[in-house]
Amino acid sequence: MPTAPVYDEFALFHENAEEFGIPWIGSPAVRRVEAETSAGTISALAWGREAPELVLLHGGAQNAHTWDTVALALDRPILAVDLPGHGHSAHRDDHAYWPAGNAATLEEALRELAPEARVVVGMSLGGLTSLALADRAPDLVRQLVLVDVTPGVNREKASAIAQFIDGPEFFESFDEILARTIEFNPTRTVSSLRRGILHNAIEVGDGRWRWRYDLPRRGSGEGEDGQIIPGLDELWNAVERVGVPLLLVRGGTSPVVDNEDVAELTRRNPKARVVVVAGAGHSVQGDKPLELAEILKGLL
């Protein structure tokens, strides 16, 4: 197994491009930006030099770099956000990283960082957060894309994801954290998983590794209404209230969204569109980034 090199978050984009056959014409214009909110600092990656056209929100236990290949393929101004408690964004004292609270925090951040974005894209937890954001701040969400998630998500559908996230808090080496990640992602290349760990984990002082993200703690809201994520019933109601174009992108092999979820989504919002990406699991942006980029280009 390879060991971890010195980490530079802006030095790995050529690997993304090479793996997916994206022409490489030199390092893209990407920088870290921040917004101060009432819940702490929100950090994001700003792609391009113009005002963002798209806002990208990652899933739970991920970070803004999950969108790197999509961003390279799109080559448009993008803001890829680290959700609260993830990536370089601040951790909450109450460890409550649920859609409603995330949306309140991101409303503050996006009014500063991406007030005129044409599309908000959210995957998994980021998708539920973007749905809550569209409900509370519709002026910030002109088009909404949910990537492999609906409010119909439950523990059974997300069991494989939960099993991975509920793993050890610390790993004795980079090789150990890589081995576990490979075990749970057998369809992904080792190079992509290694790159993802470098973006999403940190080495602690004694040589061990841990994930960078903060997880919700017991008592922070989980299970209060018997659901894997609090407030899902209200998010179904939000689907009805969404007044902007709504697109659901399903991973063709993912169990997280089923046909009943699609039927409920389109019942509550008859104008919603659904696209299935063949061969993609839950992480559509990781499994089929070029296909997802083409879908998003069609919205611009």
Give the ranges of each region predicted by the language model.
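Conserved hydrolase catalytic core segment
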Residues: 115-155
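Conserved alpha/beta-hydrolase catalytic His-Asp/Glu region
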Residues: 172-229
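Alpha/beta-hydrolase fold catalytic core
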Residues: 1-52, 75-76, 114-116, 297-300
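Conserved HGGG/HGGXW glycine-rich cap/lid loop of the alpha/beta-hydrolase fold
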Residues: 40-88
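A catalytic-pocket lid/entrance helix-loop region that shapes and gates access to the active site
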Residues: 147-175
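Conserved serine/cysteine hydrolase catalytic core
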Residues: 204-268, 273-276
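Active-site loop/oxyanion-hole signature of alpha/beta-hydrolase fold enzymes
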Residues: 38, 80-121, 294
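Catalytic histidine-centered segment of alpha/beta-hydrolase-like enzymes
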Residues: 277-289, 293
